[in-house]
Regions:
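Cys/His-rich Zn2+-binding cysteine-cluster or related metal-binding knuckle/ribbon modules and their
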Residues: 33, 41, 170, 182-185, ...
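Accessory, non-ATPase domains that flank or precede helicase/AAA+ motor cores in DNA-metabolism machines
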Residues: 1-244, 251, 256-272, 303-304, ...
Length: 631
């Protein structure tokens, strides 16, 4: 014993607990991804370096954490006594939940009904009533976190909060992760990767805007943070609360089947009404103009009344493509099967450029047509920059603000833009879907939606569901303060389409019933489970040949073939990206278990002929995706 030496712990981090290991193991199995590849990305890069371990404890001190927020907000704190009756009823329902039992609750509230106030009061009760309790709030996007951070800090000023998302520096994320992992942070607020954070005293989970497609990761581990959150809650025997004004069809289906408990908030606060929806048939609109006469007049009237207007067009840039007026040349990307978008300015470049939004290739706008030499080059279509330019000409005295991925490149820039809107420093806001999510604007009197039809008739079977949700969400930004009812104008060539007809009455239940019937008739989710096998290579023939071999293997080894369908390999809708030709193989089954069994066997078969996920010949890179959003 005299020769024994004291053991020195090299890392200040606690071991990963059993529950988080079980979550990672489930994700690895279900999404058919390596366990290390699943778990390691969730651990901050800073903690992976042994050089940082010695100074780790000092770095992780809570009182020095810039990623731990407790700065009070200027927003009004809503105490339980200040909730309206529907909010108080919803809070009472949540308060009665058994916090040692798994259950999935769904807070179904119209936009502006005060869902956030309800769940903040609920979380405050959980933390107050359960010693050492921690709570996790998941948001779909980084730009939604600053406003909610401030609200939480005002609502629970004495509780430590850790914020986790990819916009933080390595050290900031390491500090916040440490605070969550050691139980020091009571409120953990983050985007999708936060679901894999060890939280030793997790008491409940909230998934806000649960319908949002951003919860599904598209590259690498193709997981759904919402679905993993539900599994985690079940495994840890705690309740989970999903929130949305526009639930996903899968969630709605689960409510109908009695798997989720629904709590309704059917009234907006301040006795506000949802905007009146007016459909403008584009055949009647001014031809050859960027903004129709009807929109011009309505925007001018709204400006004169001193109310803000929001113009929603889900295309950033000046124009989706550049064309030649003399020949058939279009600004196609040489490395992708898409067009290079024209930007009047992009980042630090103040002169016009062409940029591919798929691979990032950027070029100067040519002075003349590369094909025929003619100088008559014309922008096709309209993006946010073009709309902004036109609005400045129509109403020169108005303060116009553009909000898209170009102007809100960082979290700081994004927060500055939204602060200007909240403080009334913008009269007309032009932007993309960034504007439609979770922001509480108080003076929007008019919403204009341009090019909504672009999503309506696409090859994406989820497009009607996505468009309806997007339009309801963007409508919900208007008329929140009460007073005169706001308006929503939508330009469309197809005003009789069910999406627009159900939207006019905000008939969510009717639209969901309509969609479920369509999906059931077409044998689509949620009535079947799907998976995609992706393949990419330099030549499309190699990608298709690889997938054809995968299909042969599945058909040879699948019992009860009638219950499992394997479609022929096809090129992807966007077949070429960054010089790689991409194809896919769709597999679907009524039984999720049967599909999982076949995918596991297929993964084993493909790995035998591959190094990692690249074939041994080096020609094809492949992956398997569960529950794809796009097929």
């Amino acid at each position: 014993l005299a020769k024994l030496k004291a053991v020195k712990a090299l890392s200040p981090l606690p071991c990963l607990d059993k529950k988080i290991r079980e979550l990672a193991e489930f994700a690895s199995r279900y999404y058919i991804y390596g366990l290390g590849e699943t778990l390691l990305p969730a651990i901050p890069k800073w903690w992976k370096s042994p050089a940082n371990w010695e100074k780790g404890l000092g770095v992780a001190r809570i009182d020095k954490l810039s990623a731990i927020k407790n700065t009070p907000s200027h927003d009004k704190v809503i105490d339980p006594e200040q909730l309206n009756q529907p909010q108080a009823d919803a809070l009472r329902h949540l308060s009665n939940a058994d916090h040692k039992k798994f259950q999935t609750l769904f807070l179904n509230g119209v936009t502006g009904s005060g869902k956030t106030a309800v769940y903040l009061n609920y979380l405050q009760q959980v933390i107050s009533n359960h010693r050492d309790a921690q709570v996790l709030i998941l948001l779909p996007e980084i730009n939604l976190t600053p406003h909610l951070e401030r609200r939480i800090a005002s609502h629970m000023p004495n509780q430590e909060m850790a914020v986790l998302h990819s916009g933080l520096s390595d050290k900031q994320r390491a500090r916040a992760w440490y605070a969550a992992t050691t139980g020091k942070a009571k409120v953990i607020l983050g985007t999708r990767l936060s679901i894999l954070t060890p939280i030793p005293n997790l008491a409940t989970i909230v998934v806000d805007e649960e319908h949002d497609s951003s919860f599904k990761q598209q590259e690498g581990l193709g997981y759904s943070a919402r679905d993993l959150a539900i599994w985690r809650a079940k495994n840890e025997s705690i309740p989970i609360l999903l929130c949305s004004a526009t639930p996903s069809l899968e969630t709605w289906h689960a409510i109908e089947r009695g798997r989720y408990q629904e709590i309704k908030l059917s009234e907006r606060i301040h006795q506000a009404q949802m905007p009146i929806v007016e459909l403008i048939q584009t055949q009647q609109a001014d031809r050859g103009t960027v903004i129709s006469g009807i929109l011009k007049r309505t925007l001018q009237n709204n400006f004169q009344e001193g109310r803000q207007a929001l113009i929603f067009v889900n295309r950033r840039g000046f124009a989706p493509a550049l064309s030649c007026g003399s020949c058939d040349w279009l600004s196609e990307c040489p490395d992708c099967s898409g067009f290079m978008v024209m930007h009047k300015q992009l980042g630090s470049r103040r002169s016009p450029v062409l940029c591919c939004h798929h691979c990032g290739l950027t070029k100067s706008v040519p002075r003349s047509c590369p094909k025929c030499g003619d100088s008559d080059l014309l922008p096709l279509g309209r993006g946010t920059q073009k709309i902004e330019e036109q609005i400045r000409e129509i109403i020169p005295q108005a303060k116009v603000l553009r909000v898209d991925a170009d102007t809100a490149r960082t979290g700081k820039l994004s927060e500055e833009l939204f602060t200007k809107i909240h403080q009334g420093e913008a009269d007309i806001i032009v932007g993309t879907q960034m504007l439609s999510k979770g922001h509480d604007y108080q003076n929007i009197g008019l919403v204009c939606v341009l090019d909504a039809d672009a999503r309506l008739y696409s090859n994406d079977y989820r497009a009607p569901e996505t468009l309806f949700a997007q339009l309801v969400q963007v409508a919900g930004r208007a008329g929140r303060s009460g007073g005169e009812q706001a308006k929503m104008l939508i330009e469309t060539r197809y005003p009789s389409d069910p999406v627009y007809q159900y939207l006019r009455n905000y008939d969510l239940a009717g639209f969901m019933k309509h969609l479920l019937k369509e999906r059931q008739d077409s044998r689509l989710p949620p009535y079947v489970s799907q998976a995609l096998v992706h393949a990419q290579s330099t030549h499309m023939a190699d990608s298709l040949s690889f997938l054809a071999g995968a299909k042969v293997h599945i058909e040879k080894n699948s019992p009860n073939q009638g219950r499992l369908v394997c479609f022929d390999p096809v090129p992807k809708a966007l077949a070429k990206v960054a010089g790689k030709e991409r194809a896919q193989l769709l597999i679907e089954a009524e039984s999720r278990t049967q599909l999982q069994t076949q995918l596991n066997a297929l993964d084993e078969f493909l790995r035998k002929q591959s190094t990692g996920r690249i074939t041994k010949q080096g020609k094809v890179r492949w992956s398997i995706e569960r529950d794809p959003l796009l097929i």
